[in-house]
Amino acid sequence: MIRSTLPLFALALAISAPVLATELVPVPQFRSVELRGGGDVAVVPGPVERVTILEGSTQFTHMYVENDGQLRIDACNERCPRNYQLRIQIQSPRVPNLAVSGGGQITTMGGFAPEGHLAVAVNGGGKIDARSVDASEVSAAVNGGGELLVRPRQSLAAAVNGGGNVRYWGHPSVSMAVRGGGNVTAGY
């Protein structure tokens, strides 16, 4: 009896185990990125746009580019296992505009050339840390909770609706609108 249940136990363990192999995801050119439903995305400088799943799988995570040039990352489909972990690395010659919806985190890494403008947004929870981006102007919006961390050189246009935080570093001119709670504050 022990012999017959052992393969079933091993199969159940294998099905529930996280997928750890890296996977290069072919996607067409994009101008912006939206992470939906959780996960961690690192945006790093590179010679071409490239998306790599470091932890997770395209079995459960769907990525596609909309007509407007937005790379959408749907973290978990209906077959997603419990405790599914998603980590993605996006390489790009320029920093794309960034958005998180329904949880998750996007972090930019240093080494990008200075940008003229960067737009970042969080809707329904999540975090974007773009402090490593040297952008002249930043547009930042939080709706329904979340946090944005940015470093604009000249100007910041920030909006918070229904809770959330926009924190900025440097000494930009700041225009802000806060409705229903939230903060736009200098970082330290």
What does each model-identified segment do?
Residues 1-188:
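Intrinsically disordered, low-complexity terminal regions
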